Structures are given as C-alpha cells and as structure tokens.
Amino acid sequence: MWGGEMNIFKQKEREFALNRIPVLKEKFPESNQILNFLSHILEYHNSIISEISDLSISLDNQNIESRLGKGKPALKLSEYDFEPFLKYFYPLLNIVYEHGTPQMKERVEHLQSLEKKEILSLISSFLENGISDDMLRFFLISYLQPILYTFADKVKFEHERWFKNYCPVCGSKPSVSFIMDTEDWEGARFLRCSVCLTDWLYVRTKCVNCGNVEDDSLDYFISSELDYIEIQTCKKCNSYIKIIDLRKDGLAVPDLEDIASVSLDLWAQEQGFIKVERNFMGY
C-alpha cells in the first residue's frame, strides 16, 4: 500500500473539518473559545490548500526513494525555498490579529515588522532545529501546515516499511493517533504528523515515544463520556498520546478531536505524563 492512497480519505476529511467544529463545541463546551478561533484557522488552511493544489509542485522522486530507503524522511524541508509561498504568511497574521488573544496580537505586530528574509530565516531554523518559543511555533506551523499538506500529497511511501515514530514525509513527531478499518487492515493504528498531517501505520500496542511494548507498563484510559478517545500512557518514559477510534465515531477528525479534548491533556499531565508532541495550537 502506498501513502498516496490515503489522500482520498484525508481530502474528504479536510472538506468536512469545518463542519465538525459545531459538533465538537457540543462535545467539549469548555473548548468553545479555542474552537471558534480554530475555525478561522481552518478556513485559512482550506483556502491555501485549494489554491496550492492547482500549482505544479515537482519533487525529486529518486531522492525521496533514496532517503526513505535509508530510514530518513522523504523531504529535507530546511533546504526548500519557501519564498514563493511567503505571500500566504501575511493573511494568517491578519486573521490572528482579528481573532486572537492580546498576546497573539502583540506577536503579529512584531512579525509584521520583520523583513521577508528574516521570516524565511525563522522558517528555515524551525524546520531544521525546531523551536522552543510556543507562540512562534504556533504561527510557523499554522502557516506551513497547508503548504506541507500539499507537498505530502506528492510523496509515496510503503506503510509496511515505515513503522517509525516520526513522519515519513517531514520527520516531525505525531501529535495524535487513530484507529480505523481499511481494505488492507482491520483495526489498524495510524499516527498523524503534528506538522504536515501525514498519516502512517504504527504498532497498536507500542509506546510512540520510546518504543516500549511491555504490556505491564502501557496503560489505556477511556472516559465514559468520550469512549471514542483513548489515552495511551507509558510508565517507562512517562509519555502519553491520544488514540481516536474512528470505528466508534466515523466522522471524527483526529487532529481536531485532539485540540478540542484539551481537558484530557490536563488530566494526563496531572498524572505526571508528558505528551509525545503538542498539536499546532500548543496543547
């Protein structure tokens, strides 16, 4: 099975993502403010995906196959020139300034004052080394996600050869996982990239952070009110990740469910666990 075959599912998922927001607001009333803000970001993402999907994006398939064969992510994004896509950064700033928090608005004003080469440098640095500034991380991933989503659409990989805990496309960590039935697998577990939203196959009973497979140190918690969301914790490395069961709720959108269920993150963190990777909203 090639990675590209999942994109029909993902494209439909992106189309229905906005329609999922009202449902999530009912399920998670405590997250309404977050979800209202998220709806504006999703509208921005969908418009960018729609526009960029019409462009001719060429990738070096030979280099991609070589990198994947060596266990490296298909794309070394820090080497890519994002200047042609920089025009999409400024609409994001306008959206955040209009709908974001006072702290976000202050950061928008700072980012608007930077020269283009400074913004490109921030993007390159983030893709090469990551970033510790939570607010800046939000802006950069919010901007990059729809662009890299279209890049990932061009990358093919064999799921059976990539049971790793980092993205086969961009190398980022997953922020959420989910279970679904496919033509090839029943009850298969997938990880979803925190940056480019690529999905890839992973062992169901294995810690995503450290690779632990010992049953006595892996626990699973399910809320009686949210039985389609499970939290997998690992006592060896004190990490956790959510598992969204699409067999119980076929309309669930894993990355959105993860953001909306921030109350579950707070519970897991109170128990002393650290998330494998935060979503782009920082939760």
UniProtKB/Swiss-Prot annotation:
Look up keyword Cytoplasm and say if it applies: yes
Where in the cell? Cytoplasm
- A GO term for molecular function: ferric iron binding
**GO CC annotations on file:** cytosol
The record describes the protein's role as: Necessary for formate dehydrogenase activity.
Family, per the entry?
A: Belongs to the FdhE family.
Name of the featured protein:
Protein FdhE homolog
Species of origin reads Aquifex aeolicus (strain VF5)
